[in-house]
Amino acid sequence: MINLPKNCVVFTYPKMGDSGKFLPAELRGAAGLTGCTLQCKAYESAFAQIKALGFELIAVGSMGEAGTSEFKRATGATFEFINDEKFELEAPLWLETFTTGDGKKFYHRQTLIFRDGKEIKRFSRIAEPEQDAQNILAALRNL
């Protein structure tokens, strides 16, 4: 199990690349399956405010070490990224996943807020990734 900080925001991103061509019929056209880069850049812009509120920020994806490192570099993100290609967080955090027609598994876009090591808020299947960071900042301010 991956250890998370006691106070943190964890968001999962699908970043499917070419596997997006093989989405199952029920997910084709679903909101929120694209926009990983925009979401990460928005979180980078909000990172200082999230830290000032006493929370760490962690992005979780399943791209492999090299893909995760390259994606983090490409977005200019300074917060932590976790490569969870073995889906070690799926069961303990009750994270939703999906599988594409080419047999690859991904996390749905979700954001969880933890305080004192306990999940206190969850946002599932985020439809507007570029708005997620601002929505989370509002939620953190209202805790």
Annotate each predicted stretch with a short phrase.
Residues M1-L143:
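Chalcogenol-based redox active-site neighborhoods
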